């Protein structure tokens, strides 16, 4: 069974980049009838906050990306300890004693010589006595995973195609800090094995991590004496950039809370992000099944995916315009019925704007100043107004015949007097909602304005 996971760290709110990753993992699983799991990567006890765990769950629920299961790394520490000891027994992890300052100095020296900043494995050259001396001085070791330099790392990436890394050009990653806490690499691999993850879909900034983790998977399988297992399939999607094509701090701060405050529908955000970075056009598709049916990793491109806020707003507007009254009635101001919704709907960019447009019906409105000629015209309109199945059509037809007005001269003063605006909902739908008595009063009020 296809099983994917979304593994955020609860050190902040989800932003648009990892929302997209969560969505694509959900889509990959659901397209194939599989499972989408949530893993909370909370091994960093100092930075992880419970409030962010709740926020992550709430954001996924708002987006309709309900996980089929959840794990928390903070509750699985014994599994990482067991894996660590197994790798240690197999000679695949080793202690290192350099301080952060010493490592940074080595890095600067390598860069100054035009060399890649790869860890030099100095710790492997220490004798038992030298290690004992460091620990006697109170220097606790951190631990690195020892890459096998004799075996090239290869995999078929579902987005990037064939990948090949020379492990000698990679640093042995630190997997455990001197205080005993875990870094990302080992817990992630252990969890992927235990959770039965079949596909890892993540950003291209993880490509080198994948190269390391493939060897880690192999080492863990060997330690478990399970040579039949193989690592998950990997897919690395292009990073999200602003519409100018640059990485943007703003994208890193754009989260579900910001989108909700702006009135963006979850369906719009899903429709936008589902196809962003693929060869398929972004369209206002609210039907998840349509998006799932067309989801295909082979359409994912290598170029950075450009997130355009204006495009999201266009998608949102189109989706709002297609929403049924039943979908939104609980979110509308009191008094708006199906007829009211359909009257104002074409003018909405967000559902939240419904209240503003509904005030054209409930009032009060602010009328502009009219010329003497228009005031006389509106006085005639107040007398002419007759209530039938189509009061707007009847009124404008009679006024056209009696005054000879047409076009803007016929319609605009009426709209301004009845709504206080130069544009807005279809008056044929709006006028019956205003009602005969109120409509006549507004026309008469405009006609009774004192001349300037």
Curated annotation (Swiss-Prot):
The keyword ATP-binding applies. Its EC number is 6.1.1.17. PROSITE patterns: AA_TRNA_LIGASE_I. It catalyses: tRNA(Glu) + L-glutamate + ATP = L-glutamyl-tRNA(Glu) + AMP + diphosphate. The gene is gltX2. Catalyzes the attachment of glutamate to tRNA(Glu) in a two-step reaction: glutamate is first activated by ATP to form Glu-AMP and then transferred to the acceptor end of tRNA(Glu). A motif ('HIGH' region) lies at residues 8-18. It comes from Erythrobacter litoralis (strain HTCC2594). Its main location: cytoplasm. Gene3D superfamilies: 1.10.10.350, HUPs. It is found in: Cytoplasm. This is Glutamate--tRNA ligase 2. InterPro entries: aa-tRNA-synth_I_cd-bd (IPR045462), aa-tRNA-synth_I_codon-bd_sub2 (IPR020751), aa-tRNA-synth_I_CS (IPR001412), aa_tRNA-synth_I_cd-bd_sf (IPR008925), Glu-tRNA-ligase_bac/mito (IPR004527), Glu/Gln-tRNA-synth (IPR000924), Glu/Gln-tRNA-synth_Ib_cat-dom (IPR020058), GluQ/Sye (IPR049940). One of its GO terms (molecular function) is glutamate-tRNA ligase activity. Keywords: Aminoacyl-tRNA synthetase, ATP-binding, Cytoplasm, Ligase, Nucleotide-binding, Protein biosynthesis. GO terms for cellular component: cytoplasm.
């Amino acid at each position: 069974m296809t099983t994917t996971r979304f593994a955020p760290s609860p050190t902040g709110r989800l932003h648009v980049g990892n929302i997209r990753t969560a969505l694509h993992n959900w889509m990959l699983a659901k397209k194939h009838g599989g499972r989408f799991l949530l893993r909370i990567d909370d091994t960093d006890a100092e930075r992880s906050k419970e409030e962010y765990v709740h926020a992550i769950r709430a954001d996924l629920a708002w987006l309709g990306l309900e996980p089929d299961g959840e794990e928390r790394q903070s509750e699985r520490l014994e599994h990482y300890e067991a894996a660590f000891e197994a790798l240690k027994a197999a000679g695949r992890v080793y202690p290192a004693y350099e301080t952060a300052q010493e490592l940074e100095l080595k890095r600067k020296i390598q860069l100054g010589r035009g060399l890649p900043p790869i860890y030099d494995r100095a710790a492997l050259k220490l004798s038992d006595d030298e290690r004992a001396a460091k620990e006697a001085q109170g220097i606790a070791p951190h631990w690195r995973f020892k890459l096998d330099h004799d075996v090239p790392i290869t995999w078929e990436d579902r987005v990037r195609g064939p990948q090949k890394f020379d492990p000698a050009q990679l640093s042995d990653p630190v997997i455990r800090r001197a205080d005993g806490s875990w870094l990302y690499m080992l817990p992630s691999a252990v969890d992927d094995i235990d959770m039965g993850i079949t596909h890892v879909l993540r950003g291209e900034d993880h490509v080198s991590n994948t190269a390391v983790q493939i060897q880690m998977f192999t080492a863990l399988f060997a330690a478990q004496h399970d040579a039949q297992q193989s690592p998950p399939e990997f897919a690395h999607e292009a990073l999200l950039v602003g519409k100018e094509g640059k990485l943007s701090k703003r994208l890193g701060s754009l989260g579900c809370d910001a989108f909700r405050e702006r009135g963006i529908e979850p369906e719009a955000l899903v429709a936008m992000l589902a196809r962003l970075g693929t060869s398929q056009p972004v369209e206002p598709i609210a039907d998840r099944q349509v998006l799932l049916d067309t989801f295909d990793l082979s359409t994912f491109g290598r170029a950075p995916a450009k997130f355009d806020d204006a495009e999201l707003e266009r998608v949102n507007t189109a989706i709002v315009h297609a929403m049924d009254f039943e979908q939104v009635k609980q979110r509308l101001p009191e008094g708006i019925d199906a007829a009211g919704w359909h009257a104002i709907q074409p003018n909405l960019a967000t559902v939240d704007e419904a209240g503003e447009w509904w005030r054209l019906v409930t009032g009060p409105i602010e009328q502009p100043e009219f010329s003497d000629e228009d005031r006389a015209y509106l006085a005639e309109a107040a007398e002419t107004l007759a209530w039938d199945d189509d009061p707007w059509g009847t009124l404008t037809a009679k006024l056209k015949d009696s005054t000879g007005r047409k076009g803007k001269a016929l319609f605009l003063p009426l709209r301004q007097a009845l709504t206080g605006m130069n544009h807005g909902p279809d008056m044929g739908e709006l006028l019956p909602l205003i009602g005969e008595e109120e409509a006549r009063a507004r026309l008469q009020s405009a006609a009774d304005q004192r001349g300037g």
